[in-house]
């Protein structure tokens, strides 16, 4: 790992993967830093294999690197490609998580980017209001790395926060965030799972005796969804409450989540036909976090924008999920799933530019949005689209010797379109 790069991408999840690929393909010397030992972020670390946001109510929308990734997975027989189905099924495609690690790192390396695993960013280099690099901790010590542009794809907005960016956190009245989840991969399933909206309520009803007997905690709904390998499914049900940026809370979630997972699978064995011989093959090594910091940018995407299928002159990515999906922040609350059918909406480039800071972009879950808009835009395919835009912008800024904020948005959009991004 060298001491100077054109572009440093922090975080190897969906947004970071796309950022690094796009930046490197456009000629920037690009370093991708990931604090764990593989790429994929929420999709692999937290085991959320449902890549959501490929299409809106009117049909296929998202192309570019997100589509390229899915097609690479399909070629290897490692994805359930739902694009041919009707909405909402068409917006989800399920992937094999182990294969996803291999495919994503192959795409990043073939693009020409460098990956450094097990690298934790602990500080930011700044001159006045300009981010000039990062400080990273590895098993070999601490290193300062300069960069013309840093892209924060950490999900939690960690780098932007270290740089002093303004951000919103949780809901306005009390700062609480949506519950996080321990995902569970299981094998030995003989029940055919095809429709979460039908399968979930059926399984939940069968588990009522287990809830009544306190064999498991109360669940409003048990989501069991298929995986590409025969007999495998993943369960997205356990909910853990608190702040994901509280170190002890986030640590406790791991053992609490594993305890919930084992109790739940035992109940499935006992009460649900088709799950009699189901067993845990893996639980997430990271909790699936839905909400934390939203870095305030030059524009804040709004609920009205999302629901009205807004178009912007600097729209560089699509939000395709036709719903505002707000999970419970407390156990006694009800989730909100507010559907709308107006069509996909633009995510403006200004939402990726932290207000008052130069030398830095954000992409993914930490975008600039109000809470309802964020609850739609946070999906992983949307995050990849933002990542491709941010990586492309960073490389253009380097080649033009400009700050990201100084780029011509129309030129950026033309470049994305030339890269098969449907805008």
Question: Model regions: which residues?
Answer:
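Short, hydrophobic/aromatic-rich segments at coil-to-beta transitions
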Residues: 128-134
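Conserved N-terminal/central alpha/beta ligand/cofactor-binding core
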Residues: 22, 28-29, 34-127, 178, ...
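Flavin (FAD/FMN)-binding glycine-rich loop and adjacent Rossmann-like elements that form
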Residues: 42, 137-138, 142-149, 153-423
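Beta1/beta-strand and adjacent pyrophosphate-binding region of the FAD-binding site
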Residues: 2-13
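N-terminal Rossmann-fold NAD(P) dinucleotide-binding loop
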Residues: 16
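Membrane-embedded transmembrane-helix bundle of lipid-linked glycan/lipid transferases
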Residues: 8-10, 19, 24, 129
């Amino acid at each position: 790992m060298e001491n100077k790069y054109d572009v440093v991408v922090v975080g190897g999840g969906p947004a970071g993967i796309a950022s690094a690929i796009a930046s490197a393909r456009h000629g920037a010397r690009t370093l991708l830093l990931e604090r764990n030992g593989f790429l994929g972020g929420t999709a692999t670390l937290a085991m959320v294999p449902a890549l959501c946001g490929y299409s809106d109510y009117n049909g296929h929308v998202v192309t570019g690197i997100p589509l390229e990734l899915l097609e690479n997975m399909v070629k290897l027989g490692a994805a359930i490609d739902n694009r041919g189905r009707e909405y909402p099924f068409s917006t989800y495609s399920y992937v094999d998580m182990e294969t996803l690690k291999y495919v994503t790192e192959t795409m990043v390396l073939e693009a020409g980017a460098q990956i450094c695993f097990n690298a934790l960013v602990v500080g930011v280099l700044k001159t006045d209001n300009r981010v000039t690099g990062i400080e990273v901790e590895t098993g070999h010590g601490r290193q300062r790395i300069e960069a013309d542009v840093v892209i924060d794809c950490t999900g939690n907005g960690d780098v932007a926060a270290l740089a002093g960016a303004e951000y919103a956190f949780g809901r306005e009245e009390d700062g609480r965030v949506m519950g996080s989840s321990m995902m569970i991969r299981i094998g030995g399933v003989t029940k055919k799972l095809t429709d979460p909206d039908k399968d979930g309520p059926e399984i939940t009803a069968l588990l009522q005796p287990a809830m009544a007997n306190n064999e498991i905690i109360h669940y409003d709904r048990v989501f069991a969804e298929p995986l590409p390998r025969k007999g495998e499914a993943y369960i997205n049900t356990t909910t853990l409450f608190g702040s994901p940026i509280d170190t002890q809370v986030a640590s406790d979630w791991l053992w609490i989540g594993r305890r919930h997972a084992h109790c739940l699978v035992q109940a499935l064995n006992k009460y649900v036909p088709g799950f009699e011989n189901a067993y845990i093959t893996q639980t997430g090594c990271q909790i699936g976090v839905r909400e934390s910091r939203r870095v305030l940018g030059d524009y804040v995407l709004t609920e009205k924008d999302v629901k009205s299928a807004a178009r912007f002159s600097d729209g560089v990515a699509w939000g395709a999920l036709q719903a505002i999906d707000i999970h419970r922040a407390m156990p006694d609350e009800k989730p909100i799933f507010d559907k709308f059918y107006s069509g996909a909406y633009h995510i403006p480039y200004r939402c990726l530019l932290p207000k008052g800071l130069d030398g830095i972009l954000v992409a993914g879950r930490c975008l600039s949005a109000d809470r309802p808009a964020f609850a739609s835009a946070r999906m992983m395919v949307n995050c990849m689209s933002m990542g491709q835009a941010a990586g492309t912008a960073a490389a253009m800024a380097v080649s033009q010797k400009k700050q990201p904020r100084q780029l011509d948005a129309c030129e950026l959009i033309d470049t994305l379109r030339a890269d098969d991004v449907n805008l």
